[in-house]
Structures are given as structure tokens and as C-alpha cells.
């Protein structure tokens, strides 16, 4: 099984796709583009697979983009 990415790598993919940091509450950061808002738990060494799939769905970015880092 492939190694799951850290929150830093997930955030870098979001930034590459035009998302910008909006706010943080506790350990959750909010990133937003023109249409969508994505919540990322940060900092984490590994993002759990279910959370990663949820981030993929919220952002509209293919799951494979996050795995192939």
C-alpha cells in the first residue's frame, strides 16, 4: 500500500490548484477557491485515507493527485 501524504503535502496540492488559506480553528485549516471550501486537519504526519477521500471530494481534485506525491 502506498504511503499516505502528510497535511503539508495535501495543502501544497490545494495551493497548486488555486485554493488559498482562509482561517484556522484549533487543528483544522480552511482553504477556499472561487467555488469550494475544503477543511484540512493540520498539522498531521499522515492524513487518514477516509479524510483524504473527503478532501478530494470537497475540492474536486482527483484522489490520485494526493496519493502520487
Question: Language-model segments: what does each one mean?
Answer:
Residues 1-25, 30-69:
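Basic nucleic-acid-binding interfaces
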Amino acid at each position: 500500500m502506498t504511503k499516505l501524504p502528510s497535511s503539508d503535502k495535501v495543502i501544497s496540492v490545494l495551493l497548486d490548484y488555486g485554493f488559498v488559506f482562509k482561517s484556522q480553528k484549533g487543528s483544522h485549516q480552511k482553504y477556499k477557491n472561487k467555488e469550494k471550501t475544503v477543511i484540512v486537519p493540520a498539522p498531521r504526519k499522515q492524513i487518514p485515507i477516509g479524510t483524504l477521500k473527503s478532501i478530494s471530494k470537497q475540492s474536486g481534485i482527483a484522489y490520485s493527485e494526493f496519493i502520487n506525491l
